[in-house]
Amino acid sequence: MGQLYMQRFENWGAVSKGDFDQTWGVALQTFAKSGNWGGVEKGVRHIKTYGTSWGGYALIEVDDPAAFAHYQAHHYQNYGHVARVTFEPVSDMDAMFAATVEQLRSKSTR
């Protein structure tokens, strides 16, 4: 398994509807072609996109740093004028703490 990233896209407030719609058109074409928002054929796997009132998140898995660099560059070149885009590495804390939680549960039931 590669590194998980939570990608955040926050819409800029002063963007015209035309620019916003045109950019989403590019984004949807990119996704339809490659299966992800960054247009890479392999090395970045799209898991899920979540929308919010201000933009949203996309959860991705990265296996190839060069592909991730291309993925990021695509965002900055094509979407940066309508949204602030950031990428945060995330980890599965449920899995990380599972053994400790299980030990605590077993102690509390004695």
Report the location of each language-model feature.
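Short amphipathic alpha-helices in soluble, non-transmembrane regions
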Residues: 69-77
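Conserved short beta-strand edge segments in small beta-sheet-based binding/regulatory domains
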Residues: 79-92
